[in-house]
Amino acid sequence: MKKLLILFACLPLLGACTQTEPVSGNRAAAIVAEIHNPRSKNVVVASHRGDWRNYPENSIAAIESVIGMGVDIMELDLKLTKDSVLVLCHDRTIDRTTSGKGRVCDITYDSIRRCVLKTGHGVKTTHRMPTLREALEVCKDRIVVNVDQGYEYYDLVLAV
């Protein structure tokens, strides 16, 4: 009888032993499964442009930071350079977010890459504007990516 009572007392603890990530370690797939689970009681957290309070928005460092925080979805913005490279940038120009000036669509990727990103307060950093490919390599299997500004580049995004 005593063993039976201990067994029933321990049953609720088994419910806490659920696996949140697949055995493969693909956290992004687990998040997508969670989103599609109508019985889920979990809150899914999304980050707009990454950890832009501590790093330049849409930068690799901002993405790495939110992954480290356990954020589930990274929302990013895309623009296309003059030489057809998809880069992470919210604005039509690079004026606010980098040390450079001009419209993204009028500048080559090589020229943009020479600029440094700025913080939200306009302070220059050592960070550079990443390409979509670079960002996706960082995010792969670790966080779900939501492309916010990028529908006009749909086919190019799929190619990456």
Residue spans for each PLM region:
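Phosphate-group recognition and catalysis centered on beta-loop-alpha active-site segments
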Residues: 17-160
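Bacterial Sec-dependent N-terminal signal peptides
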Residues: 1-27
